[in-house]
């Protein structure tokens, strides 16, 4: 391990997936941050990176009395960090940002402490991701699904063709829909396989619309619990955009979630994706959280 920064707040560079005791400390701290802030400090991918060497993440820790009270993580392109609420306004966030190698740092929730730190460092907000949510009567109304004429639907488990063929069509539609997206675009078979290794993944929660044997689009659901579920990824193949099929594709997944017991559904969407935000607002979704990237 290498040590960076002044002696009063040492920032240690490490790989937590190689150190079980430190990883457990980090997870405890993240739970305490969640309890106080009301939002997760690290995204799902970065939490997985604490334990999975294959993701190739590097970690930066600050400890007091043998206990981690500050954590940074990077995948080489972007970074995330957390400071325990009891140790904020002590320069720890500044030290972590100085140690992180990327220009962009996520602030999940864009809470006042993060805004204050960004302002003090002269960081600029360059990206904003919205968490939108729907529940109650609005959710039940949004979950009304009418199958478009000439279109069929299936799950990944019941899709026509071999698994290899279906996943190839799924990847093609994904990369057409998200060619512009920094995390969701440019997927290959290995990336899809890693995504399916998540503990929450179920074949029955990946839904498809079909035009014969052509994939129209997909709706991937993430089940946090019976009551709380998520539109994880939804996308249309290029050939089927602009044909009014986006709305039924979203409703197909919402019906699936409501039938599975969902009482609240969330999704993540780029704040500057005006058409998508408007479509979700039309279905009854409202903004619940904001996540931003600040850049040096």
Swiss-Prot record:
Q: What's a GO biological-process term for it?
A: mycothiol biosynthetic process
Q: Which InterPro entries match?
A: Acyl_CoA_acyltransferase, GNAT_dom, MshD_Acetyltransferase, Mycothiol_AcTrfase
Q: Give the EC number(s) listed in the UniProt record.
A: 2.3.1.189
Q: Where does acetyl-CoA 1 bind?
A: 81-83
Instruction: Spell out the Pfam families in the cross-references.
Output: Acetyltransf_1, Acetyltransf_7
> Quick one: which residues bind 1D-myo-inositol 2-(L-cysteinylamino)-2-deoxy-alpha-D-glucopyranoside?
44, 183, 222, 230, 268
- Where acetyl-CoA 2 is bound, by residue? 234-236, 241-247
Catalytic activity reported: 1D-myo-inositol 2-(L-cysteinylamino)-2-deoxy-alpha-D-glucopyranoside + acetyl-CoA = mycothiol + CoA + H(+)
Q: Which GO terms describe its molecular function?
A: mycothiol synthase activity; protein-N-terminal-alanine acetyltransferase activity
Keywords, alphabetical: Acyltransferase, Repeat, Transferase
- The chain's coiled-coil residues are none
Domain N-acetyltransferase positions: 17-146, 156-296
**UniProt record similarity statement:** Belongs to the acetyltransferase family. MshD subfamily.
Query: Whom does it interact with, and what assembly results?
Result: Monomer.
| Functional note | Catalyzes the transfer of acetyl from acetyl-CoA to desacetylmycothiol (Cys-GlcN-Ins) to form mycothiol.
The protein in question is named Mycothiol acetyltransferase
Organism of derivation: Corynebacterium efficiens (strain DSM 44549 / YS-314 / AJ 12310 / JCM 11189 / NBRC 100395)
According to the entry, what is the taxonomic lineage of the organism? Bacteria, Bacillati, Actinomycetota, Actinomycetes, Mycobacteriales
């Amino acid at each position: 391990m290498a040590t960076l920064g002044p002696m009063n707040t040492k920032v240690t560079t490490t790989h937590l997936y190689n150190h079980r005791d430190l990883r457990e400390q980090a997870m405890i701290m993240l739970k305490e941050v969640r309890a106080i802030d009301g939002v997760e400090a690290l995204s799902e991918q970065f939490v997985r990176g604490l334990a999975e060497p294959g993701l190739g993440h590097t970690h930066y820790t600050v400890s007091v009395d043998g206990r981690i009270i500050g954590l940074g993580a990077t995948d080489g392109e972007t970074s995330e960090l957390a400071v325990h609420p009891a140790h904020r306004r002590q320069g720890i966030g500044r030290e972590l940002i100085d140690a992180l190698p990327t220009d962009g740092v996520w602030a999940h929730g864009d809470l006042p402490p993060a805004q204050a730190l960004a302002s003090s460092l002269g960081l600029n907000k360059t990206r904003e991701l919205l968490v939108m949510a729907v529940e109650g009567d609005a959710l039940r109304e949004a979950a009304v699904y009418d199958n478009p004429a000439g279109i069929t639907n299936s799950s990944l488990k019941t899709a026509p063709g071999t698994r290899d063929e279906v996943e190839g069509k799924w990847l093609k539609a994904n990369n057409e829909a998200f060619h512009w997206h920094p995390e969701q675009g440019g997927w290959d078979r290995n990336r899809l396989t890693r995504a399916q290794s998540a503990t929450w993944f179920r074949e029955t929660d990946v839904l498809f619309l079909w035009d014969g044997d052509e994939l129209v689009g997909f709706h991937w659901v993430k089940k946090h619990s019976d009551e709380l579920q998520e539109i994880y990824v939804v996308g249309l193949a290029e050939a089927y955009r602009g044909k009014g099929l986006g709305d039924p594709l979203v409703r197909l997944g919402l019906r699936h979630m409501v039938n599975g017991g969902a009482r609240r559904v969330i999704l993540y969407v780029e704040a500057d994706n005006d058409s998508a935000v408007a479509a979700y607002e039309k279905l009854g979704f409202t903004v619940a959280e904001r996540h931003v990237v600040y850049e040096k």
